């Protein structure tokens, strides 16, 4: 995988391949906004991304910067990946599908750097479970981004904690499978590992 704007456009086209929308594989042509929902369920603007006419060049820049930094091996990929994803989200290059694309790119870049846990445990489910933490980290890291004065550390910490949690879940799953127990016992064991509320999907992840 060579990370380029064209590669990202191809992924986006595949993502929207079965959609009635004709936006797949195309950068945005109208201004978009990153919105969030408050405690009362009301939408508000969290961040205003780059304008459409700046998008293509910005995507080219961040792809080149990531590839160059990765090749120099001075910074660990686990730091470079969150920085790239943060820039991607600030640019918000597509009219729709930016969140899904960011998680797909996160998984693919982790694969390329040897972190394969996304094949077995969904990073998407982690984001959904901790949506407030995601938006808080993103909002904090986006302050000053347009002026090059952002502090991306909150987003790096968020993504690293998500990756760590995913590996812990994977380890729990391996422990359950390695014991070769019955399906019923496996489910009981999985439930015992959970504290507080949990969903059926979370238990299914632990019981392949």
Label the model's feature ranges:
Residues 1-208:
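FIC/Doc superfamily catalytic core
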């Amino acid at each position: 995988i060579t990370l380029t704007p064209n590669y990202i456009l191809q992924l986006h086209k595949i993502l929207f391949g079965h959609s009635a929308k004709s936006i797949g594989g195309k950068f945005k042509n109208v201004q978009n906004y990153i919105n969030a929902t408050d405690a009362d369920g009301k939408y508000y603007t969290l961040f205003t991304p780059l304008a459409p006419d700046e998008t293509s060049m910005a995507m080219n820049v961040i792809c080149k910067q990531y590839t160059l930094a990765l090749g120099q091996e001075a910074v660990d990929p686990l730091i470079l990946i969150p920085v790239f994803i943060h820039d991607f989200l600030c640019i918000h290059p597509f009219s729709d599908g930016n969140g899904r694309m960011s998680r797909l790119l996160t998984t693919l870049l982790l694969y390329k750097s040897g972190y394969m846990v996304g094949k077995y445990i969904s990073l998407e489910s982690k984001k959904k479970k901790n949506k407030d933490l995601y938006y808080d980290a993103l909002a904090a890291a986006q302050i000053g981004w347009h002026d090059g004065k952002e502090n991306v550390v909150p987003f790096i910490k968020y993504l690293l904690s998500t990756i760590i949690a995913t590996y812990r879940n994977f380890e729990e799953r391996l422990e359950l499978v390695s014991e070769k127990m019955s399906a019923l016992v496996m489910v009981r064991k999985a439930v015992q590992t959970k504290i507080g509320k949990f969903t059926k999907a979370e238990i299914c992840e632990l019981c392949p």
